Amino acid sequence: MIVNFSFFLLLFVSVFVSSADSKATISISPNALNRSGDSVVIQWSGVDSPSDLDWLGLYSPPESPNDHFIGYKFLNESSTWKDGFGSISLPLTNLRSNYTFRIFRWSESEIDPKHKDHDQNPLPGTKHLLAESEQLTFGSGVGMPEQIHLSFTNMVNTMRVMFVAGDGEERFVRYGESKDLLGNSAAARGMRYEREHMCDSPANSTIGWRDPGWIFDTVMKNLNDGVRYYYQVGSDSKGWSEIHSYIARDVTAEETVAFMFGDMGCATPYTTFIRTQDESISTVKWILRDIEALGDKPAMISHIGDISYARGYSWVWDEFFAQVEPIASTVPYHVCIGNHEYDFSTQPWKPDWAASIYGNDGGGECGVPYSLKFNMPGNSSESTGMKAPPTRNLYYSYDMGTVHFVYISTETNFLKGGSQYEFIKRDLESVDRKKTPFVVVQGHRPMYTTSNEVRDTMIRQKMVEHLEPLFVKNNVTLALWGHVHRYERFCPISNNTCGTQWQGNPVHLVIGMAGQDWQPIWQPRPNHPDLPIFPQPEQSMYRTGEFGYTRLVANKEKLTVSFVGNHDGEVHDTVEMLASGVVISGSKESTKIPNLKTVPASATLMGKSESNALWYAKGAGLMVVGVLLGFIIGFFTRGKKSSSGNRWIPVKNEET
């Protein structure tokens, strides 16, 4: 009996001790994903005395030190976390290296107030590792091409395609007018950049740097105007991408469609060292809807600075390109440089008046990822003065249908006497207005804004002094800017003044509302600088904090820009510019986005559904107004078809 009792006592103690010493476990399913965007489920159990500060870290490459995670999630996002077990599902991007996942215990007493992320939240501690998963792989491996995006070249019957793969083995594009017969091919040039090319931390630190893979660049040639082409990139030995398609550019087209915005960034399914942009998901979603509605009409996208907001954390570029691939692989994706791609402490051009303007917003990238991951038309470049390769894609232009598009850099020298100024001058003076009656200039930092961006006051003054006379003299139709994360439309303006009659004054729009959610306040009233009193100046015709993008539609007679809001995908502001010089201010009245397959560029945007009687009544009223307006316009413009004078019909609106 005594022996039996001792046996059971020993068994009880051993079971108790075993239970007390049990370790947390973590598993993943599946252990291999096919492509970027596929999801993995991470499950854990055995977490004793769980805390709402316990967290899950994502690591790639898998041998990364504990504090070199790419992102994290708190375990309390699972509904069962208090019971010591749970699961989280995460869509992941192929970083050309395996992932692993680790669970940590973290307590309030271990919070380091000096160790914070971009939002000033304390970064989680890594002192107590509870469990680590097996490695997660991508079935496509490092060789499969991803991050596919298109752009125009200097030749009108071509289309550039760029993509990323994990090794430098030769890749190709094959293309044709049928997805079943990709009979044309071209070899792609591979290139890469190294950690030593970065100019500061975090880009050149062990935390921010990740291998960017190989960037491939090739051109599809001898394209027929306005024809849909199918293509895929890759190689027989490493694998081919899915088949994508696009509509070739037609410079003689009678209609132009473009989707334009700035400061979009990207979203990540985890929290990381820097702020990411959840609103960018909606921006991409609505633009994809509009592209699909176009059918076989060509279009393009213009992203005017602050592209990914990686700011030195390399993998954020991968997240960005994975997010935009559905649209960037279908229409050309054009960019200009912003402060968050470029600015660094030793940048070559930093005059005394700009010492407080050009800081370290590039996170040590000094324009390198931007310069190599994109290849825009033209050959503009500036030396960085360091090991980094020259900064490219600074200023360039091209025609698309009825519009001449110009891109400029506000981060490098734009003053008189500089190479960029001379390019802008020559380019604007050489535009054939019979071929392209409308000219659209785009840059990152705005020439005009009514936000309280006092730091950029001097650069705005310099832009007005040096660039605005070129815009006015050469009858620029529209100037688009980002940097301020709001939408704002100005009257046709020159020297901060608008009246009733001008000669060629451009309309300025700030369109930095595509994703970044840090928003400055509007300019307060001078005698109440510390109170939320924000009068809207007369020059500002419409402004809002709503996220979204702009849609440009132009034919030979009219260019229309509409602001589409992300919360409903509908138009919230519209402005029309006629080839004759007349500018018609729009309204904040929300209108449904037309089906671009069937609605011509000149069509009036239809409002929300209403009764037939009311619709016909409004229609009759519009016809009367249209006749009167046509008579007035005809009276003042008869015999003066070449006049560039602008007449502005103002309607002033604001959304807050």
UniProtKB/Swiss-Prot annotation:
<dbReference type="InterPro" id="IPR041792">
    <property type="entry name" value="MPP_PAP"/>
</dbReference>
<feature type="binding site">
    <location>
        <position position="339"/>
    </location>
    <ligand>
        <name>Zn(2+)</name>
    </ligand>
</feature>
<dbReference type="GO" id="GO:0005794">
    <property type="term" value="C:Golgi apparatus"/>
</dbReference>
<feature type="glycosylation site" description="N-linked (GlcNAc...) asparagine">
    <location>
        <position position="34"/>
    </location>
</feature>
<feature type="glycosylation site" description="N-linked (GlcNAc...) asparagine">
    <location>
        <position position="475"/>
    </location>
</feature>
<feature type="binding site">
    <location>
        <position position="483"/>
    </location>
    <ligand>
        <name>Zn(2+)</name>
    </ligand>
</feature>
<feature type="binding site">
    <location>
        <position position="444"/>
    </location>
    <ligand>
        <name>Zn(2+)</name>
    </ligand>
</feature>
<dbReference type="InterPro" id="IPR015914">
    <property type="entry name" value="Purple_acid_Pase_N"/>
</dbReference>
<dbReference type="GO" id="GO:0005576">
    <property type="term" value="C:extracellular region"/>
</dbReference>
<feature type="binding site">
    <location>
        <position position="339"/>
    </location>
    <ligand>
        <name>substrate</name>
    </ligand>
</feature>
<dbReference type="GO" id="GO:0003993">
    <property type="term" value="F:acid phosphatase activity"/>
</dbReference>
<dbReference type="Pfam" id="PF00149">
    <property type="entry name" value="Metallophos"/>
</dbReference>
<dbReference type="GO" id="GO:0045040">
    <property type="term" value="P:protein insertion into mitochondrial outer membrane"/>
</dbReference>
<comment type="subunit">
    <text>Homodimer.</text>
</comment>
<dbReference type="InterPro" id="IPR025733">
    <property type="entry name" value="Purple_acid_PPase_C_dom"/>
</dbReference>
<feature type="glycosylation site" description="N-linked (GlcNAc...) asparagine">
    <location>
        <position position="204"/>
    </location>
</feature>
<keyword id="KW-0964">Secreted</keyword>
<feature type="glycosylation site" description="N-linked (GlcNAc...) asparagine">
    <location>
        <position position="76"/>
    </location>
</feature>
<dbReference type="GO" id="GO:0046872">
    <property type="term" value="F:metal ion binding"/>
</dbReference>
<keyword id="KW-0732">Signal</keyword>
<keyword id="KW-0408">Iron</keyword>
<dbReference type="GO" id="GO:0030943">
    <property type="term" value="F:mitochondrion targeting sequence binding"/>
</dbReference>
<dbReference type="InterPro" id="IPR029052">
    <property type="entry name" value="Metallo-depent_PP-like"/>
</dbReference>
<dbReference type="GO" id="GO:0005740">
    <property type="term" value="C:mitochondrial envelope"/>
</dbReference>
<feature type="glycosylation site" description="N-linked (GlcNAc...) asparagine">
    <location>
        <position position="495"/>
    </location>
</feature>
<dbReference type="GO" id="GO:0005768">
    <property type="term" value="C:endosome"/>
</dbReference>
<dbReference type="InterPro" id="IPR008963">
    <property type="entry name" value="Purple_acid_Pase-like_N"/>
</dbReference>
<feature type="binding site">
    <location>
        <begin position="483"/>
        <end position="485"/>
    </location>
    <ligand>
        <name>substrate</name>
    </ligand>
</feature>
<dbReference type="InterPro" id="IPR004843">
    <property type="entry name" value="Calcineurin-like_PHP_ApaH"/>
</dbReference>
<keyword id="KW-0479">Metal-binding</keyword>
<feature type="binding site">
    <location>
        <position position="309"/>
    </location>
    <ligand>
        <name>Fe cation</name>
    </ligand>
</feature>
<dbReference type="GO" id="GO:0006109">
    <property type="term" value="P:regulation of carbohydrate metabolic process"/>
</dbReference>
<dbReference type="Pfam" id="PF16656">
    <property type="entry name" value="Pur_ac_phosph_N"/>
</dbReference>
<feature type="binding site">
    <location>
        <position position="306"/>
    </location>
    <ligand>
        <name>Zn(2+)</name>
    </ligand>
</feature>
<feature type="glycosylation site" description="N-linked (GlcNAc...) asparagine">
    <location>
        <position position="379"/>
    </location>
</feature>
<feature type="signal peptide">
    <location>
        <begin position="1"/>
        <end position="19"/>
    </location>
</feature>
<protein>
    <recommendedName>
        <fullName>Probable inactive purple acid phosphatase 2</fullName>
    </recommendedName>
</protein>
<keyword id="KW-0325">Glycoprotein</keyword>
<keyword id="KW-0862">Zinc</keyword>
<dbReference type="GO" id="GO:0005739">
    <property type="term" value="C:mitochondrion"/>
</dbReference>
<dbReference type="GO" id="GO:0009941">
    <property type="term" value="C:chloroplast envelope"/>
</dbReference>
<feature type="binding site">
    <location>
        <position position="306"/>
    </location>
    <ligand>
        <name>Fe cation</name>
    </ligand>
</feature>
